[in-house]
Design a protein with these regions (language model features):
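Conserved helix-turn-beta segment of the N-terminal RecA-like "Helicase ATP-binding" lobe
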Residues: 1-23
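Conserved helicase ATPase core of P-loop NTP-dependent helicases/translocases
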Residues: 21-36, 55, 207-209, 217-226, ...
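Conserved helix/coil segment N-terminal to the catalytic DExD/H
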Residues: 22-65, 76-81
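Conserved RecA-like P-loop NTPase helicase motor core
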Residues: 44, 74, 231-341
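Walker B catalytic acidic pair
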Residues: 69-70
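Post-DEXD/H (motif II) to motif III coupling segment of the RecA-like Helicase ATP-binding lobe
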Residues: 73-133
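Interdomain linker/hinge connecting the two RecA-like lobes of the SF2 helicase core
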Residues: 116-216, 220-227
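Long, largely alpha-helical accessory region at the distal end of helicase-like NTP-driven motors
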Residues: 318-380
């Protein structure tokens, strides 16, 4: 809202959703061609409301420009109804318009918006212009033998579910994938490794964001840091808005360490962040692209950003199906590492790590497809 007013001072804005209810009576007249001719008009709507029939039916769709931020979200079954809006002009914005492991949703997006604008503006084009350059460091994190056993047991169940369902992903199958992923995300060794990284690298005045899996892990890490004399602040969606605002103001004014779950993946913009520590990460490329983008935003006196990433590995190369997990972890790191200042140094680290587990870094890099690697995890 504030940005629209800043760049288009004469614009009239009708807000929809998040407590705004006046639109229910005014949307039809606000978007009529008669009123639109008097001044620039924008309907600023949240997706949850804009995808409902009662919004679409009241919206005058003549001479309409439809702009969708984070357009990948529109392809979900929950929001796909929004494609009923028959706008003459359509623009979808996203660093990752393809939906992870959702061909139907991706097709719905591409069918509606039809074409990708060329040339595609990639991260390599933005570095040094809209984004700062960055260093990328990986840190090996070992699963315990017990965690490896849990992973292998879950893999057996997933393999049976895959064989039973073929390509169709039942709710039970997806739930098994999620349960197995949490074993890696919540690995016990991550807290001690992350604590040591901050002990060695954090300096007062820096602005760090740490991505955790859940509140329990976030609190465990906060306590571990406190025991080492390092203060941190929690930031998550269930916090009261005033508390969130206070945390961000303190962070902007004095720096520090914010512990977050997924709250900073979309929607919260803090350009002053100069360091990121990734404790928990999905295999979904959208997540690492968004996280990298959050850290690389330009800010006053910010010369570059630094990203630390925890890579999960088994305790030995003979621990069964867990080695395929390491393959996906390395693939994520390969993609994160592209265009980093220290790309060659980190690539050497990844190469040594791959060889340790009888993996070929070049083969992993050539495959470079999370959907196919996910099949490795499923069928092994």
């Amino acid at each position: 809202y504030e940005e629209l007013k800043k760049y288009i001072p004469m614009v009239k804005i009708l807000q929809v959703g998040q407590g705004a209810s006046a639109w229910k009576d005014n949307l039809s007249s606000f978007t009529s061609l008669t009123n639109a001719a008097s001044s620039p008009r924008v309907v600023l709507a949240i997706l949850n409301t804009a995808s409902k029939d009662n919004f679409i039916e009241k919206l005058n769709q003549e001479n309409l420009i439809f702009v969708a931020d984070e357009v990948h979200r529109l392809g979900s079954k929950k929001f796909r109804n929004i494609f009923k809006i028959d706008a003459d002009y359509r623009l979808g914005l996203s660093a990752t318009p393809e939906r992870f492991r959702d061909e139907e949703g991706t097709k719905a997006i591409l069918d509606y918006f039809e074409n990708k604008l060329e040339p595609i503006y990639e991260i390599k084009d933005a570095l040094g212009k809209a984004l700062v350059h960055y260093d990328y460091h990986v840190h090996e994190c070992l699963l315990s033998f017990e965690e490896c056993e849990q992973w292998n047991d879950m893999s057996e169940k997933i393999s049976k579910a895959w064989n039973a369902n073929g390509q169709e992903e039942s709710d039970g199958y997806v739930a098994l994938l999620s349960q197995r992923a949490k074993i890696a995300k919540k690995a016990e060794s991550k807290i001690s490794k992350a604590t040591s990284i901050l002990q060695e690298n954090y300096d007062e005045g820096q602005r760090w964001v740490v991505y955790c899996e859940e509140e329990v892990q976030m609190e465990e890490f906060r306590i571990a840091l406190k025991e080492e004399g390092i203060d941190s602040m929690k930031f998550y969606s269930e916090m009261p808005l005033e508390a969130q605002k206070g945390t961000l103001e303190k962070f902007e004014n004095f720096g520090g360490i914010i512990l977050s779950i997924k709250m900073l993946d979309e929607g919260v913009d803090i350009p002053s962040i100069d360091h990121a520590l990734i404790i928990a990460s999905d295999q979904n490329p959208r997540q690492y692209i968004q996280r990298r983008g959050r850290v690389l935003r330009k800010s006053d006196n910010k010369q570059k950003a630094v990203i630390h990433d925890l890579i999960i590995t088994p305790p030995s190369s003979e621990t069964g199906k867990v080695c395929n997990l390491t393959k996906t972890e390395i693939l994520r790191a390969i993609n994160f590492n592209k265009n980093a200042i220290n790309e060659m140094q980190t690539k050497n680290v990844l190469d040594k790590l791959a060889k340790k587990y009888n993996l070929d870094l070049n083969q992993i890099e050539e495959k470079d497809d999370f959907n196919n690697v996910e099949e490795d995890l499923t069928e092994d």
